[in-house]
Amino acid sequence: MGAPILYCAGPAPIMNCGMQNRSGSEDVASKKMADAGLPVIARFEVRHRNYLAPDGSINRPLPAFASDASLLTALYRAMVLLRIFDRKAVALQRTGRLGTYAVSLGQEAVSVGIASAMRGEDVLLPSYRDNGALIWRGVKLEEILLFWGGDERGNHFSGPVEDFPFCVPVGSQAPHAAGVAYAFKLRREPRVAVCMFGDGATSKGDVYEAMNFAGVHRLPVVFVVTNNQWAISVPLRLQTGCETLAQKAIAAGFIGEQVDGSDVVAVRAAAEDAIVAARDGQGPRFVEAVTYRLGDHTTSDDASRYRSADEVQTRWKEEPIARLRNYLVGQKMWSKAEEEALAAECHARVEAAVERYLATEQRRPETMFDHLYARLPEAYAAQRRELAGEGDV
């Protein structure tokens, strides 16, 4: 029997990924099987979705929701807020008032676009760079700052209470997402789990195990990979031999789609379709949002050591906020006065959140033991007592 032929669709015409490698040369083994007349038993496609060009022009007819000016401006406002929040968080870290921080610069469209397609009763399982999704879903800015300031109370945000906290070990939230979705299915609840992670997480076994389980049981879960081209300092070409990350869903038995992750309209549309399908009992979905990390991996990283300034400068031309602003201005949905008012509003909101964060009474060091076990083992209990200054141990 012949090997399945995988067809992938990107911005260019559909290419035969089963017969060619990245250089475009033909795979000798596949050609040999084809020449021998071995039958093709399956074909698969991964399609690429994009609506807005970097200059704000339209590549193809927009989805229905794009006629709602209030929604588009809400998406824009959320991305601007996230960027201003990021800048302030970095400033806090540089002045010793915040711990290591992961910026979202260049990736704002992914977390905001995905979250905007979710219902309130759905459950988000975010990665550490998905502040935009948390903010859209109602998490307070000061709660996010508490987390990055090393305070576990930041992981117990006031709402949505069933959303999961940030997951720092990459990919480890994927099995949790499958479990949440399994619970939804067993309870016959029309809810969806949305699991977000980066391209580096697709190299972890947790992700494949979760996807396989979800595929077998047709679970209402959407896996979203933010492909920002870099897993810290490791480029995508050293992470996978695949033409796309979306095609990894095929092995698990469900649909994967690639989307322009710098086009918030495309991200929202892909997320909406995937979530609706999962909610309607069509099984899991996988969305690969192709974007670019314009900033360092975190505030403890120096990306200039492993990528060129020219590469970053080129990618700045594709960034999501200017792209949507160009469209809104061109459609007379946004003005200079509104832009100035939004900037002032976002700065005021962020500064107020920072004041509340800095005014929060700091937790004592021994409280680090309070979020590990239901019953603390004696060895850890002794350490806790020592930190608390409760006498000899």
How should each PLM-predicted stretch be described?
Residues 82, 120, 345-352, 374-378:
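A short structural micro-motif
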